[in-house]
Amino acid sequence: MNLLLLLAVLCLGTALATPKFDQTFSAEWHQWKSTHRRLYGTNEEEWRRAIWEKNMRMIQLHNGEYSNGQHGFSMEMNAFGDMTNEEFRQVVNGYRHQKHKKGRLFQEPLMLKIPKSVDWREKGCVTPVKNQGQCGSCWAFSASGCLEGQMFLKTGKLISLSEQNLVDCSHAQGNQGCNGGLMDFAFQYIKENGGLDSEESYPYEAKDGSCKYRAEFAVANDTGFVDIPQQEKALMKAVATVGPISVAMDASHPSLQFYSSGIYYEPNCSSKNLDHGVLLVGYGYEGTDSNKNKYWLVKNSWGSEWGMEGYIKIAKDRDNHCGLATAASYPVVN
């Protein structure tokens, strides 16, 4: 082959392989990298920026539709911006739904007027939003948050509990640390172990480790757990009368990855395919009509910069949207 022709072919191949970036995004890209402390090699930077730009365009399109009234929630760029949705799901969604020993069944209270809105944060039984990092330990944060609330309601003291204790020590009950687990398995571990350490004594590391539980630092315990029937009405009664509740949801969608504010409704959200454990801390409605714009108030474990300072409102009474009522439970504290 002619040398000049060969060079031309090679140059053409290189040009086709190199992503073309939207220069109008350059300032935002560099600011995003600085904010989230991203350092890449040359080849990885090209790949990550291409992903970031694709996500940014998706967010802009959605928010344009939101402004026109086509959606009830907005989206924004966040720390997950350089991740594909597949990467995102593999890293942070660690709920592993499977058959397991059931707890006691929730007995719905009779002849009780249920309030139209509840927010357990106002009662002082919810700790600040935490961040699970790149570890599939959502189940541990959901379980610890639920037990934190029950212990507060019993003792009047709000103590942050150790997720790392659960990540490292509950393998015998069926959990797999950063590779996923179940809140009910965590409650079972706490019962069998005789306690759970405080966050202060056993801090979170966002990685698997050997069990370092020390009984002298245990500040919480449970005697089992209660499973709630798979209906939103029963879940509403449990939230109103029991406290924050551990729930699982379908968190697999880009719309949730970049959720910002408003009432989340994703047409493709499943009520059965659950992959993320969260903490349900209340419910309510937007506007003046309590029969419209209803939502569940959910505490996530992706840090306070995600969503509404770490929280999300999910559509309520819309056919168990995203599955919040499918696998709800709470620990029993005597």
Curated annotation (Swiss-Prot):
EC assignment: 3.4.22.15
Tell me which positions the record assigns to the signal sequence: 1-17
Gene3D superfamilies xref list: Cysteine proteinases
User: What main location does UniProt list?
Assistant: other
**Mind telling me how this protein is modified after translation?**
During export along the endocytic pathway, pro-CTSL undergoes several proteolytic cleavages to generate the CTSL single-chain and two-chain mature forms, composed of a heavy chain linked to a light chain by disulfide bonds. Autocleavage; produces the single-chain CTSL after cleavage of the propeptide. The cleavage can be intermolecular.
Write out the catalytic residues in the record: C138, H276, N300
Cystine pairings recorded for this chain: C135-C178, C169-C211, C269-C322
Binding annotation for Zn(2+) 1 = E122
Q: Which residues does the annotation say bind Zn(2+) 5?
A: D250, H253
SMART domains xref list: Inhibitor_I29 (SM00848), Pept_C1 (SM00645)
Q: Any idea where this protein resides?
A: Lysosome; Apical cell membrane; Secreted, Extracellular space; Secreted
Regarding protein family, the annotation reads:
Belongs to the peptidase C1 family.
Q: How does it assemble?
A: Dimer of a heavy and a light chain linked by disulfide bonds. Interacts with Long isoform of CD74/Ii chain; the interaction stabilizes the conformation of mature CTSL.
What protein name is recorded for this chain? Procathepsin L
Q: Which organism is it from?
A: Mus musculus
Lineage runs: Eukaryota, Metazoa, Chordata, Craniata, Vertebrata
